[in-house]
A protein has these predicted regions:
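Peripheral, non-transmembrane regulatory/ligand-interaction domains of membrane transport proteins
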Residues: 1-243, 248-250, 256-259, 263-268, ...
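Hydrophobic alpha-helical transmembrane segments and their immediately adjacent juxtamembrane loops
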Residues: 2-8, 262-357
Length: 357
C-alpha cells in the first residue's frame, strides 16, 4: 500500500476552550479539519497476515497482533466508539483528541499511552512539519491515532507483510516499540538534511553574506527549537518506560527501548551542536557585514585623505586676496596640477607601503 506524501506547513491550531470543561470531556483541539477519517486494521502472527481498511473489531483475537490505525482524531464519535470497545479511560481519549500535547508516557489500567511528535523535513521550503501521534498499547491490541492520512510507518507495514525481522514472531509490545523507533529514525533524516543546509549556509555567509542569510539563520533557530521541544520530552518518556514495570510490556523489550533512548541522546547532542553552529553562523554574518563595512570606510577614508591636500591648495589659491604671487605666474595653473599629481602619487605610495590598500 503506497502512502502519498501529505506533510505541509502546520497551521496554528484553532483550539477549543477546554479550560472550564469537566475532566475527561473529549473535545478536538487542533487544526480545523473537514476530511473524512480513514482507518486501517492489520492483523498478523507468525503464520498469517491481513491488512484491510476499517476497524475490524470483530476479529480481535489473543493469538495474533492486532494493529488498528486511525488517521484523523477530529471525529469524536469514532473516538468514543473505539474507547468503549477497548475500555479506554476518558482522560486518555481527551489527550488523544488534543493535538497540542507535549510528548509523554502515561500508564493506565487499560494499557500504556505514548504521545510522540512525528517530524518531517521539507527541503524545498526548508521547513519542519510536526504531527502528533498517539500510540496505545493494550493487552490485546496496539492503536495508533494520527492527525491525518499518511505516516512514516510504511517500512513497518512492509516488514510485517514480507515477514522480515522478528516483528511477525513478536507481540504487541514489540510493535509498540517498532512504531516509536520508526518515528525516531525519521528525526535522524531531518537532522541530516538540516546539517547539509547549515554547511551550505556557512559557505554562503562566508562568500557573500546578505540580508537573506540572516533570515535563514533565524529560521534555522526556529527549526532546531522545534526539534528540541519534540526530542527532550521523548527522552523523558522512554526513560520512564525503562524504569517502570508494566504487565503490558515484556522486560525483553526494554533492551530495544534502551537503544531508542540512546538514539534520543544522540539526536539531542546533534541538535545542541547544530544550535551552537547556527549561533556561530549569526556571529559570522555580523562579523562579515562589519568587515565589509570597514572595507568600505577604509576606501572612503583613503579617498578623503588623498583629496584633502588638493582641497587645501585649491582653497588657498581661491582666496580673494589682491596680491597672491603665484596667480601672476604664466604656468601657475600647470604647476598646481603637477603639485596635485605629486601629492596624489606620494600619498598613494604611502598607503601601499603601509598596506592599507
Amino acid at each position: 500500500m503506497m502512502i502519498k506524501p501529505r506533510f505541509r506547513r502546520r497551521a496554528t491550531p484553532k483550539s477549543i476552550n477546554t479550560v472550564f470543561q469537566p475532566p475527561g470531556t473529549i473535545s478536538y483541539v487542533g487544526e480545523q479539519r473537514t476530511e473524512e477519517v480513514t482507518t486501517e486494521t492489520i492483523l498478523y502472527n507468525e503464520h498469517e497476515f491481513s491488512q484491510q481498511e476499517g476497524i475490524l473489531l470483530d476479529r480481535l483475537e489473543d493469538d495474533q497482533v492486532n494493529w488498528y490505525n486511525i488517521d484523523g482524531v477530529h471525529d469524536i464519535n469514532l473516538l468514543e466508539r473505539v474507547g468503549d470497545k477497548f475500555n479506554i479511560h476518558p482522560l486518555l481519549l481527551e489527550d488523544i483528541a488534543n493535538t497540542t500535547q507535549r510528548p509523554k508516557t502515561e500508564f493506565y489500567p487499560e494499557g500504556i499511552y505514548q504521545c510522540i511528535k512525528m517530524i518531517s523535513y521539507d527541503a524545498t521550503h526548508h521547513e519542519l512539519m510536526d504531527e502528533q501521534v498517539s500510540i496505545l498499547l493494550t493487552q490485546h491490541a496496539v492503536l495508533t491515532f494520527q492527525e491525518k492520512t499518511g505516516d512514516v510507518f510504511e517500512s513497518i507495514r512492509e516488514r510485517i507483510a514480507n515477514s522480515r525481522g522478528r516483528i511477525r514472531t513478536s507481540g504487541n509490545d514489540y510493535l509498540f516499540y517498532a512504531l516509536m523507533d520508526s518515528i525516531i529514525d525519521h528525526y535522524f533524516v531531518a537532522i541530516e538534511q538540516i546539517g547539509e543546509y547549515l554547511n551550505n549556509l556557512e559557505d554562503e555567509i562566508f562568500d557573500e553574506p546578505d540580508k537573506e542569510s540572516l533570515e535563514k539563520v533565524q529560521k534555522n533557530k526556529r527549526l532546531l527549537l522545534t526539534l528540541r521541544r519534540a526530542i527532550y520530552p521523548l527522552r523523558e518518556s522512554i526513560s520512564r518506560l525503562l524504569k517502570e514495570e508494566s504487565p503490558f510490556m515484556d522486560n525483553q523489550i526494554k533492551s530495544y527501548l534502551q537503544d531508542a533512548y540512546d538514539h534520543c541522546i544522540q539526536i539531542i547532542e546533534t541538535v545542541e551542536s547544530y544550535r551552537e553552529i547556527n549561533a556561530g553562523l549569526r556571529d559570522m554574518y555580523l562579523s562579515s557585514v562589519s568587515h565589509k563595512m570597514n572595507q568600505i570606510m577604509q576606501v572612503l577614508t583613503i579617498m578623503s585623505s588623498i583629496f584633502i591636500p588638493m582641497t587645501f591648495l585649491a582653497g588657498i589659491y581661491g582666496m580673494n586676496f589682491e596680491h597672491i604671487p603665484e596667480l601672476t605666474w604664466e604656468h601657475g595653473y600647470r604647476y598646481f596640477w603637477i603639485m596635485c599629481g605629486i601629492m596624489f602619487i606620494s600619498l598613494l605610495g604611502f598607503f601601499k607601503w603601509k598596506k592599507w590598500l
